[in-house]
């Protein structure tokens, strides 16, 4: 629904619009010139499609998970866009927290992990409560607040269930 104004504006400007997504019922597909059933998180499949169609521009509207794919395709095809590595940093919570820390910017203590065991061994470095989050999800999906490490295993399972990469972060909870 949120993509509709952008698609309409592109068409007003005389641009040929092509949408792709794994959800064929998304309303933007109905007004685009073409639609392809390709997941916006599958960057290689979107790149292959973009090369086949010889596109000359790519954007991702109202979709955090699609932003890295759009940047990747633009970079690979020499199209205008944001640098892929920059977009990855902005959309993957562990990379973003590391970036903030490395550059001396305020942020809660956080660390990224791939396994429960790895995180469990590191819990002595955290002050509870903490938040457990998938690194690459949005809309608070898979986010769990825990009060001690006995709750970690269930929280990690929940976070990973929403992570495309299988990675998660643990970050200290900041009370306002």
Regions found by a protein language model. Name each.
Residues 58-61, 110-113, 173:
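Structural motif
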Residues 24, 136-138, 174-176:
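Glycine-rich beta-alpha junction loops
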Residues 40, 90, 113, 146-149:
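Conserved aromatic
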Residues 106-109, 125, 129-132, 144-176:
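Conserved ATP-binding module of the ATP-grasp superfamily
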Residues 45, 118-122, 151:
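Short acidic active-site motifs
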Residues 1-86, 117:
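ATP-binding N-terminal substructure of ATP-dependent carboxylate-amine bond-forming enzymes
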Residues 75-142:
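A conserved helix-loop-beta module that forms one wall/lid of the active-site cleft
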């Amino acid at each position: 629904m949120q993509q509709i104004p952008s698609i309409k504006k592109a068409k007003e400007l005389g641009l040929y619009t092509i949408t792709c997504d794994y959800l064929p019922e998304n309303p933007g597909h109905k007004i685009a010139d073409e639609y392809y059933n390709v997941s916006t998180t599958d960057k290689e499949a979107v790149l292959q499609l973009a090369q086949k169609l010889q596109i000359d521009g790519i954007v991702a509207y109202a979709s955090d998970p699609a932003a890295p794919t759009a940047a990747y395709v633009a970079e690979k095809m020499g199209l205008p866009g944001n640098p892929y590595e920059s977009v990855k940093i902005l959309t993957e919570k562990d990379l973003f927290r590391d970036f903030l820390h490395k550059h001396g910017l305020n942020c809660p203590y956080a660390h990224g992990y791939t396994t429960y065991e790895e995180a469990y061994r590191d819990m002595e470095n955290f002050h509870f409560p903490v938040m457990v989050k998938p690194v690459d999800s949005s809309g608070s999906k898979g986010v769990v607040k825990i009060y001690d490490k006995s709750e970690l295993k269930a929280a990690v399972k929940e976070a990973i269930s929403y992570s495309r990469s299988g990675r998660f972060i643990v970050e200290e909870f900041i009370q306002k």
